[in-house]
Design a protein with these regions (language model features):
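Start-of-helix register in tetratricopeptide repeats
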Residues: 33, 81, 114-115
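Canonical positions in the second alpha-helix
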Residues: 72, 105-106
Length: 116
């Protein structure tokens, strides 16, 4: 389990570095990135709560993150990072079958995705 936490934590930081290096002049892209970035922040906060055995509070944050990711997905259905986090947050709240679907959909887009 710790291995997965380390793996996903590493993924979170690498995604932020990649996102920080890109620039967009489109308002739609900025809104989409904002939803995604907000969701990532919620996931990180939830992870910290889990480490403190505050599982129920963490699940609420994962659910909030998922809602933001859903909105980001609606505007960009070809983003494997969004699908990865959708799978991750769904798995964290206990919906393993749905999580698998998101992971598999992300792998269809990018078969060698590091986080999936």
């Amino acid at each position: 389990m710790r291995y997965l936490i380390v793996l996903f934590t590493s993924l979170f930081f690498s995604i932020n570095v990649i996102a920080a290096g890109s620039d967009s002049s489109s308002g739609g892209d900025s809104s989409k990135k904002s939803l995604y970035a907000d969701a990532v922040k919620l996931v990180k906060r939830a992870g910290k709560l889990e480490k403190k055995d505050k599982t129920e509070k963490a699940k609420k944050l994962y659910a909030q993150a998922f809602k933001k990711l859903e909105k980001a997905y609606k505007s960009d259905k070809k983003n494997p990072d969004v699908l990865n986090y959708m799978g991750f947050t769904t798995r964290k709240v206990g919906n393993f079958d749905q999580a698998e679907k998101f992971y598999l959909e992300g792998l269809k887009i990018k078969p060698n995705h590091n986080g999936i």
